[in-house]
Amino acid sequence: MRDVFFLAMLPVLLFLMAKRPFIAVGMWIWTALFFPNAWLYGIGANFRYNLIFTAVTIVGYLVMKDKPKVRFGTLGGLILLFFFWTLASTAMSEGVPAVSWEYMTRFFKVILLFVFVVLIVDKKLHIDFFLWCVVLSVGFFGALEALKYIVSGGGHKIEGFSGHVLGDRNELALAFVIALPICYYLLQEYGKQSKMLRLGMMGVMGLIVAAVIGTQSRGGFIALMVLAAYFFVKSDHKIPLAIVGIILAGILSQFVSSEWTTRMDTIGTAASDESFMGRVVAWKLSFILAMNHPFFGGGFKALETYSVWLDLSKDFFSYSFFYTGDALPDTEHPHAAHSVYFQIMGDHGFVGLAIYLAIMLRAFLLARSIALRAQAHLGLRWVVSLATMLQLSIFAFGVGGAALSFAYFELMFAIYGLLLVMDTRILPRALKQQISA
């Protein structure tokens, strides 16, 4: 039945996407995060929906009559510079060339999404639709899995679909955390229009928090706690927020297992935790890879190439200041970098890391700048709210990504695109209209 329903809806969706390219770019991110193929079992599972929606987006933009004026600004310039830097590092890859180019192709699709967000999204309706697509993908999956977790009394382990960008439970947990501020923005904007919608969005947010717990991801839990603290500091409703937090924590404590508690307890004893120190070993080898190739690094997935891993392991004791305790490199299997920062360092060198950090910092500060500029104008409260929430999402990614190989997550580059649109088109246009009025 799923296949029949989805395939019956597909022509309608394609028609709407062709007529309104902003719908197409929203469906692009929806398919990227929701992975509809995993929900379908018959003929519907054989279609490449993301590719189809991407093609419709591109064609839809090309035939648009009134294309928005495009300015990429500093943030866009940094992102495009980083993209060309990854091209150079891929061309000089130390790993398996075919693997490096495969991941380069994947990253090209991420950059393509960023570009078309900037090209097409032009007003509040477009942004809100895009964010609803995010919530109806990541948020829907999180809420559904959280219900299973609660019904099972905490026994259900929440994981992503195999082969999906969010297949790993740690990356899935971080995606849930990143989606929470987006949910809050939509709650603020649309919750006042309907009591049912307000209660529904509050329920979804509570379930997403439960989903983070259900993944048993330490990185996701840390990101959630740091986000909660940061959100509490920035909130104007600290007492109600604290009460809700205490109630939610009390409810969720009834479902966590002893296994979850034991796993979270290792956060405080990371230096003696074998799993964590294994990550530190991977960080050090990423650092050594960058020291050997400081400008362009080893290319995509070079660290996870067995021959490269073994060669780097020979220099493991060269940098004694990089503490790894008693942990040593695995001589049988290479490992991922387990940190967006060390991942970029190893893949694209110190220069690539500098560009990547500049992108994150510029986006974070740009969100703050947008909120401050819009704050004095009553008609732009939604801009203040959205910029603040996107800043929180960037902050959550910066914290949670410190222990995950998740540097090329498309949602983050889409968020950068939304900030760019707000800064270069929506905010200047709104301010100009208010001045002329």
Give names to the regions the model predicted.
Residues 1-88, 97-98, 122-132, 186-199, ...:
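Transmembrane signal-anchor hairpin modules in multi-pass inner-membrane enzymes, especially those
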Residues 1-3, 44-52, 102-106, 165-178, ...:
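Membrane-interface micro-motifs in multi-pass membrane enzymes
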Residues 8-17, 80-91, 108-113, 126-158, ...:
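Alpha-helical transmembrane segments of multi-pass inner-membrane proteins
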Residues 30-42, 339, 343-348, 381-423:
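Membrane helix-loop boundary segments at the extracytoplasmic
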Residues 40-44, 92-101, 213-214, 402-406:
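Membrane-interface helix caps and helix-loop-helix hairpins in membrane proteins
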Residues 56-60, 240, 359-363, 392-437:
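Transmembrane alpha-helices of multi-pass inner-membrane enzymes
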Residues 147-152, 209-215, 231-274, 284-292, ...:
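A membrane-periplasm/extracellular boundary helix in multi-pass inner-membrane enzymes
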Residues 158, 163, 268-284, 296-348, ...:
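Long extracytoplasmic/lumenal interhelical loops at the membrane interface
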